[in-house]
UniProtKB/Swiss-Prot annotation:
Residues 8-80 form the J domain. Co-chaperone involved in the maturation of iron-sulfur cluster-containing proteins. Seems to help targeting proteins to be folded toward HscA. SUPFAM superfamilies: Chaperone J-domain (SSF46565), HSC20 (HSCB), C-terminal oligomerisation domain (SSF47144). This is Co-chaperone protein HscB homolog.
Length: 176
């Protein structure tokens, strides 16, 4: 455990600080860090050592969850660059995206009211495709250092993930 708890998540796993992550390398590095900090290795250690090992394990878990999920990784990367996504406070979106949001919400509501699982499935496919395309665009924005636009893209992706989740739940409810 030569690294320090204050190290950024990328440094913890020895990865380059970038949006694109080699998932196999991340998984391998995570297993290495976890094995070094596993509580069983410190069962006979003193309280202070066990506490530090638990902090390391918790830090590694949080780092792994963050870097494994593209949207969380992008938000974290922007934070490292001094950019606060402000998802709670900054809801400014382009008029085109606002219109798209309304269309998706309306399609969701109508399909639920009509119990049209096939339309919900189609909406879910559309949302997942939109999400894939936007993640690719987000990667390009981050790689280009366009942090402001990347922050806007993150906020849009948060909305898309929310409606994707709502659509998935609606399908589950209707299929029960």
């Amino acid at each position: 455990m030569g690294k320090q708890l204050k190290d950024d998540f990328f440094a913890l796993f020895g990865l380059p600080v970038q949006y694109g992550v080699d998932e196999a390398a991340l998984d391998a590095a995570y297993r290495t860090v976890q094995s070094q900090a596993h509580p069983d290795r410190f069962a006979k250690a003193g309280d202070a050592e066990r506490r530090v090992a638990m902090q390391w394990a918790a830090h590694a878990n949080e780092a792994y969850r963050t870097l494994r999920q593209p949207l969380r990784r992008a938000t974290y990367l922007l934070k490292l660059r001094g950019v606060d996504v402000q998802a709670e406070n900054n809801t400014a979106m382009t008029p085109a995206f606002l219109m798209q949001q309304m269309e998706w919400r309306e399609a969701l509501q109508e399909a639920v009211e009509e119990r049209a699982v096939d339309r919900l499935d189609a909406l879910l496919r559309e949302l997942r495709q939109e999400k894939r395309e936007r993640h690719a665009a987000l990667g390009a924005l981050l790689d280009a250092g366009d942090n402001e636009a990347a922050g806007g893209a993150v906020r849009q992706l948060m909305f898309i993930e929310k409606i994707e989740h709502d659509t998935s739940e609606a399908i589950d409810r209707l299929e029960d």
